[in-house]
From Swiss-Prot:
Coiled coil: none annotated. A motif (9aaTAD) lies at residues 62-70. The gene is Klf6. Its main location: nucleus. Residues 104-198 are annotated as: Disordered. Keywords: Activator, DNA-binding, Metal-binding, Nucleus, Repeat, Transcription, Transcription regulation, Zinc, Zinc-finger. Belongs to the krueppel C2H2-type zinc-finger protein family. Residues 104-113, 133-148 have a biased composition (Low complexity). SUPFAM superfamilies: beta-beta-alpha zinc fingers (SSF57667). It comes from Mus musculus (Mouse). This is Krueppel-like factor 6.
Amino acid sequence: MDVLPMCSIFQELQIVHETGYFSALPSLEEYWQQTCLELERYLQSEPCYVSASEIKFDSQEDLWTKFILAREKKEESELKISSSPPEDSLISSSFNYNLETNSLNSDVSSESSDSSEELSPTTKFTSDPIGEVLVNSGNLSSSVISTPPSSPEVNRESSQLWGCGPGDLPSPGKVRSGTSGKSGDKGNGDASPDGRRRVHRCHFNGCRKVYTKSSHLKAHQRTHTGEKPYRCSWEGCEWRFARSDELTRHFRKHTGAKPFKCSHCDRCFSRSDHLALHMKRHL
């Protein structure tokens, strides 16, 4: 297989040398390469987002029992806090505050994971007993509760939040200004494979594709509609494409640009997959 792209490059050079230009008509080999790339792209598996409605619990009675036990434990802890010495009460109250701050960080991180969506007007400051029971029971899948990857800047901000006292709880505006646009706070849930929530779902019948960006979803939906809005501007060329990167790759056939250079030799290529095939010769 790695001989075919090399033959195609030599043929292109020979045509340009003899005629002075390169024909826009694709060859059978180019059709074959394009088909292989499309098959590799559309047949690869992607992680699917599991909605909360698809999660099945053991029984409603067990869930209700866990909720009652969580409430009783919370009331007992509050009684212990009220009857304990000042030092113990300070430690336990700071522990409860850390739990509440942790739930707050998870809520804020889930809101700021997608920069294209607006933030909700309210923020949840108190820990939810039902949410704690569901998380501790282990019935939720890791794809439902997902948080963005951590960054050094946000870790410093989260340490500042954890360092303040129970009475110095920051306002919603301060929390949003410090965390909006940064995907970094760690929540209680497990992180998804790419670190962000997949919120853009394809609504065509039988399609279960989910994307993190709306632009990627629009490009995917063109495979269902057959729309090709990107047209080649080269004179005499009528080719159209559904994605802008495909148009850019096609336009290099007219200009002869080869931006992909081999790091082991002086060979240059117009496509990254051709360079990858060539790099196998140096292994």
